[in-house]
């Protein structure tokens, strides 16, 4: 590849990464209502670069929200990895998702609502949910199932139910703030109510498991490829 081509590609990578980093910060601070101007100011970029790399602010938001929730899921798994019982595992998992990582979960819940009017962005949501559900299945296999507890539904169904409950609680928490009304114990009970896990399973010891399978949450793959909207312009 000519030197000028490599330089252009590297510049594209740098710009796209800067926009993603800035957008993650600005969206975390201001939510979906953050403006392109705010993002560009933080990234030292121009508005037309948002259009070139992402097509629209909405697509940028959905990409950022997807990366955020995947990182939240990974952080929750890592935080719970040292748990000695199922109860401790579930408390740590849910507590992390609705505590330190609540904003990331909330952003993705907002992104899911956004695609109701931007159906062209649904594939981004679907891909993220697929990864979350697959990782949820792995988590169930490494905890509840290996205690001998028989799930009432398929493990894929239970993994989807887990995340549906987490998203619902995150939205309630964001909407009510200090009036949320759920203690950690209450939130855990809500998330796992359909599993009907008896106390003897919750208190079952967990054997150590191997390292978590790495999952790429980087959204910087085709870094200097313009968005479909830009290509059609």
PLM features per residue range, with description:
Residues 56, 117-119:
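Short loop-to-helix capping motifs
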């Amino acid at each position: 590849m000519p030197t000028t081509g490599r330089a252009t590609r590297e510049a594209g990578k740098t710009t796209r990464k800067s926009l993603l980093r800035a957008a993650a910060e600005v969206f975390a601070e201001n939510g979906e209502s953050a403006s392109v101007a705010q993002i560009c100011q933080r990234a030292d970029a121009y508005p037309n670069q948002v259009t070139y790399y992402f097509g629209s602010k909405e697509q940028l938001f959905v990409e950022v929200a997807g990366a955020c929730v995947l990182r939240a899921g990974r952080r929750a798994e890592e935080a719970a990895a040292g748990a000695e019982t199922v109860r401790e595992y579930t408390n740590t998992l849910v507590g992390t998702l609705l505590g330190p990582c609540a904003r990331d979960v909330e952003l993705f819940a907002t992104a899911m609502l956004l695609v109701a009017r931007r159906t062209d962005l649904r594939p981004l949501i679907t891909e993220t949910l697929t990864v979350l559900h697959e990782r949820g299945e792995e988590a169930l296999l490494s905890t509840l199932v290996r205690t001998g507890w028989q799930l009432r539904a398929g493990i894929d169904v239970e993994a989807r139910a887990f995340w549906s409950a987490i998203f619902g609680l995150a939205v309630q928490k964001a909407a009510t703030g200090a009036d949320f009304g759920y203690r950690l114990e209450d939130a855990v009970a809500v998330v796992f109510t359909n599993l009907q896990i008896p106390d003897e399973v919750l208190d079952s010891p967990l054997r150590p498991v191997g390292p978590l399978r790495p999952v790429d949450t980087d959204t910087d793959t085709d870094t200097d490829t313009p968005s479909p909207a830009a290509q059609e312009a």
